[in-house]
């Protein structure tokens, strides 16, 4: 990556740590590992980031796992709606996907924190050790946030590693209007945070952040004379702490995004995107043919068109036909087994007239689908 790229990465990591209260340096160019300071690295996407963070959790509870393999009694608890990369990481680590223990969620797929204790006690009875507890900030499908403070209370009560998947929603830290959504995020032991989601950065660029720098140092225990050298090295070197050997100079594009627009502009973009989702919700809620199951907490909103008439397959067909028009692009997901249309608001030029046009286009396509079904 080179010395300049490594230094810029360390600078931006310090900036992100400072937003969590995990930075103990005198200024962002202070790269000294202070006793109570956090640490982190940038990596290529949330999947690798979750794998890295959970590897740190494993090193904390089972330091011998690096040489002897993952103990068979380790499990990870988290919402049943956790991103698929959590279960994938657990499998990659040799624990098997069944080592992910789902905690019940409510009708909007938000973690039921009151269920944590019973799930935990059940695992103890089975002779299991909980390696980590995962919380969503926010859920990929709905954009809704788990109660991070309540999960933190549970983890602190039982001295469990607390990991927050903040790939999409950790940016709420930068919005004065929305930072309440992530209250308690600073109590986590590890956090992943995508810059390529809502920080105006191209894919891929994800931070893995730790409250305590020793967590990062202990994650990977490996030697290789061609890249790792004994003793201190001159400058910054993130290689001992990442899955990747060679990686892009990720700190550059994150730095230049802020250098070009400034922190306030990025903050305003996030706040505006969250607000757009609320405005779309308000508009669709006034339309009798649309159903929105929840009020958005981020820039993601799920909705259905005439759910009492259109089947899940027809909702999906509606999306395909909408995309084929070339006028709009929306995604789709399942919430509690039901198919929804899903919007992610990220264009600062989006206005109410666009919401109206989207709704009208959906109505036109849906009418055609219904007529075809009758024939």
Where are the regions that the model predicts?
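Short, glycine-/Ser/Thr-/acidic-enriched flexible segments
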Residues: 81-83, 107-108, 138-140, 169, ...
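Conserved PLP-binding catalytic core of the aspartate aminotransferase-like
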Residues: 291-322
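Short Gly/Ser/Thr- and Asp/Glu-enriched loop/turn motifs at secondary-structure junctions
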Residues: 35-37, 71, 294-300, 334-340
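Conserved PLP-enzyme active-site core in the AAT-like
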Residues: 32-33, 48-217
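Active-site C-terminal subdomain of aminotransferase-like
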Residues: 139, 183-287
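PLP-dependent enzyme catalytic core of the Aspartate aminotransferase-like
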Residues: 5, 335-375
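Conserved N-terminal alpha-helix of the aminotransferase class I/II PLP-enzyme fold
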Residues: 1-46
């Amino acid at each position: 990556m080179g010395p300049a790229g490594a230094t810029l990465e360390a600078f931006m990591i310090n900036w992100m740590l400072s937003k969590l209260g995990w930075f103990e340096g005198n200024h962002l160019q202070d790269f000294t590992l202070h006793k109570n300071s956090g640490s982190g690295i940038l990596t290529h996407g949330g999947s690798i980031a979750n794998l890295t963070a959970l590897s740190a959790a494993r090193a904390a509870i089972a330091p011998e796992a690096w040489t002897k393999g993952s103990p068979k009694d380790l499990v990870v608890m988290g919402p049943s709606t956790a991103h698929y990369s959590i279960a994938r990481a657990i499998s990659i680590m040799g624990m098997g996907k069944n080592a992910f223990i789902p905690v019940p969620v409510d009708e909007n797929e938000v973690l039921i924190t009151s269920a944590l204790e019973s799930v935990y006690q059940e695992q103890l009875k089975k002779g299991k050790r909980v390696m980590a507890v995962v919380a969503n900030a926010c859920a990929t499908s709905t954009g809704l946030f788990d109660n991070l403070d309540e999960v933190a209370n549970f983890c602190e009560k039982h001295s469990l590693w607390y990991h927050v998947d903040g790939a999409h929603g950790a940016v709420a830290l930068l919005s004065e209007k929305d930072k309440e959504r992530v209250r308690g995020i600073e109590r986590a032991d590890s956090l992943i945070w995508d810059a390529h989601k809502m920080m105006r950065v191209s894919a891929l660029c994800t931070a893995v952040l730790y409250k305590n720098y020793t967590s990062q140092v202990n994650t990977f225990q490996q030697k290789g004379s061609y890249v790792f050298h004994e003793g201190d090295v001159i400058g910054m070197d993130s290689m001992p702490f990442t899955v990747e050997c060679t990686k892009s100079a990720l700190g550059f594009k994150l730095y230049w995004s802020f250098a070009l627009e400034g922190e306030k502009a990025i903050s305003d973009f996030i706040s505006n995107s969250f607000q757009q989702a609320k405005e779309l919700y308000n508009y669709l809620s006034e339309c009798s043919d649309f159903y929105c199951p929840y009020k958005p907490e981020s820039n993601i909103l799920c909705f259905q068109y005439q759910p009492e008439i259109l089947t899940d397959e027809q909702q999906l067909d509606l999306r395909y036909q909408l995309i084929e028009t070339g006028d709009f692009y929306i995604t789709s997901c399942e919430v509690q087994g039901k198919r929804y249309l899903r919007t992610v608001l990220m264009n600062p030029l989006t206005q109410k007239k666009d919401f109206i046009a989207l709704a009208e286009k959906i109505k036109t396509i849906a009418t055609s689908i219904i007529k075809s079904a009758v024939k």
